[in-house]
Amino acid sequence: MPYAPAAARVVRVVDGDTLIVDIDTYPPVFGQAIPVRLAGCDTPELNDPDPRLRALAVAAREFVRQVLSDAPVELHDIGRGKYFRIIARVRVAGQDLSTLLLQAGLAVPYAGGKRPDHSVLLSAATAAP
């Protein structure tokens, strides 16, 4: 069952789909320096063996940094994933961060389960004008 929405401050952008946040309304043991995985999308990994996917991973991380640019965020649909990680919809300025990454072609849809194939992002990038 998801928890109620919570205001948060991003401490660090780990990669395109993981943030470290502080949630001031939570006790420090639960609310400081908490890794949050974005719900609804998956970005390439920074250590992917394919240099083209690594470049997309860096672009996704930089995109998230620019979109956030020290703005407060809201966490929605907060829950735990299969590895007990916190997974949430992250909204900044009223926009869903996962949706923005998907629209930018820097992420693929992901609802858990088997790791998605990020190579489709390469096809989309080369097909773009």
Predicted regions span which residues?
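Small beta-barrel nucleic-acid-binding modules, primarily SNase/OB-fold domains
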Residues: M1-P129
